[in-house]
């Protein structure tokens, strides 16, 4: 017991929860969703998929995600976030193993829907735990470190999947799904061993920063604003919807665009995607911390402006050097919005209501994720190019800038 007390004084246990959260996002979202972009070209060729079917496979994942976030708040309150996260990651692992054996579009879509359910049921409670383990002035940074798990997954998948795919000429992608599923299975056990539902279980208080004189953090609205209205929550949901609709178009179709429209090999396109993963490692911590310092609204405006530029640079079919710039813009802010939104919800409603409210706006976010790839695939099929899809993403990102500008600070919400 004395040894544990000494350890928690030097490193607050909340940071161990953050580390487990990084692994959770790495497995549930990083492999469960973002690896798809690297796998689609090979799967499309092997299973003879159309652009629309590729888009619908991605959409099936988001349908599952949508269904999961509807019940996350209820399940979390009944069985606890720790057990829910473990079971959700277990579902991700098993469904990915089943995708590796799929022989048709419908089979892939069915099991990838289950993957989406596991992704949603692990991600929402994990992000909501930030409000329980950290006070307001630390939430952006803590959430930022959790969301970079997706970046690590993209970085690894961009290198690993092309290697695994070439092990078998026509269906190496099956090996990729198998390996990824096994990794997720291992991570589910690690998360169950490390995560705790609240600092109170260990006799601790939420982390407020080194040397903080306030036990509840250094903002007066750490317990949430009772004056927050339903309109304010819908406002947050609208912003999160636009993020869901736009970022997923890029994540799903950029590799396919590079391979099928720009003539890049799968290996070179994988290197591009790995750069997204590497750069995204900085996105959550940098912009999450920036939102702690400059305000959530300023952080959102900066991030959406950069994303709009990333989408336009692909849509305009400019020379190759601009693709590098687009990759750079997308990567450096890739996971910033979820970290800022998780912190912002905690600022608005406090730790006790964060899981429920974050689950609600994540439901709206998931609607955007369903609409985005489906519409993008349809536009690409009709126009013969993904340029129209990226133009749409840029327009929606611009709208998100405007909505972010109109956000009220938590203390000003009435």
Model-derived features with residue positions:
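Glycine-rich segments within core transmembrane alpha-helices of 12-TM secondary carriers
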Residues: 140-159, 362-372
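Cytoplasmic helix-loop-helix junction between adjacent transmembrane helices
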Residues: 111-148
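C-terminal ends and interior cores of transmembrane alpha-helices
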Residues: 90-103, 306-318
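Extracytoplasmic gate region of multi-pass secondary transporters
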Residues: 36-40, 229-284
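Paired small-residue
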Residues: 95, 106-114, 321-329
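Helix-loop-helix hairpin linking two adjacent transmembrane segments in secondary transporters
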Residues: 145-200
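C-terminal transmembrane helical hairpin of 12-TM major facilitator-type secondary transporters
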Residues: 274-284, 289-344
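Helix-breaking motifs and short loop linkers at transmembrane-helix boundaries and internal kinks
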Residues: 48, 80, 101-106, 263, ...
């Amino acid at each position: 017991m004395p040894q544990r007390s000494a350890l928690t004084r030097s490193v607050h246990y909340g940071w161990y929860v953050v580390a487990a959260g990084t692994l959770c996002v790495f497995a549930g979202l990083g492999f469960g969703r973002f690896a798809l972009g690297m796998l689609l070209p090979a799967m499309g060729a092997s299973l003879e998929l159309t652009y629309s079917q590729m888009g619908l496979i991605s959409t099936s994942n988001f349908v599952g995600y949508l269904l999961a976030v509807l019940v996350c708040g209820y399940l979390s309150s009944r069985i606890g976030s720790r057990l829910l996260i473990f079971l959700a990651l277990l579902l991700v692992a098993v469904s990915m193993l089943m995708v590796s054996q799929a022989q048709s579009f419908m089979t892939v879509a069915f099991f990838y829907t289950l993957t989406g359910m596991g992704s949603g049921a692990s991600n929402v409670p994990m992000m909501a735990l930030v409000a329980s383990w950290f006070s307001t002035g630390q939430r952006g940074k803590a959430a930022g470190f959790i969301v970079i798990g997706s970046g690590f997954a993209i970085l690894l998948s961009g290198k690993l999947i092309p290697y695994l795919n070439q092990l078998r000429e026509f269906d190496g992608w099956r090996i990729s799904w198998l390996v990824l599923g096994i990794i997720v299975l291992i991570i589910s056990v690690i998360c169950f061993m490390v995560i705790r539902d609240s600092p109170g279980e260990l006799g601790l208080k939420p982390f407020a920063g080194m040397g903080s004189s306030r036990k509840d953090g250094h903002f007066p609205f750490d317990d949430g604003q009772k004056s927050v209205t339903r309109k304010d929550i819908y406002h947050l949901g609208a912003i999160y919807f636009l993020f869901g609709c736009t970022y997923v178009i890029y994540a799903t179709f950029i590799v396919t665009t590079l391979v099928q429209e720009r003539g890049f090999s799968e290996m070179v396109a994988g290197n591009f995607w790995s750069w997204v993963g590497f750069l995204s490692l900085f996105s959550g911590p940098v912009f999450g911390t920036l939102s702690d310092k400059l305000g959530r609204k300023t952080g959102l405006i900066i991030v959406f402006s950069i994303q709009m530029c990333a989408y336009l640079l692909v849509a305009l079919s400019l020379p190759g050097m601009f693709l590098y710039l687009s990759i750079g813009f997308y990567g450096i802010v890739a996971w910033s919005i979820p970290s800022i939104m998780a912190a912002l919800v905690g600022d608005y409603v406090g730790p006790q209501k964060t899981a429920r409210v974050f689950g609600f706006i994540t439901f709206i976010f998931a609607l955007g994720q369903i609409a985005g790839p489906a519409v993008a695939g349809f536009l690409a099929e009709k126009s013969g190019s993904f340029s129209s899809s990226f133009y749409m993403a840029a327009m929606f990102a611009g709208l998100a800038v405007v909505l972010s500008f109109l956000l009220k600070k938590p203390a000003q919400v009435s």
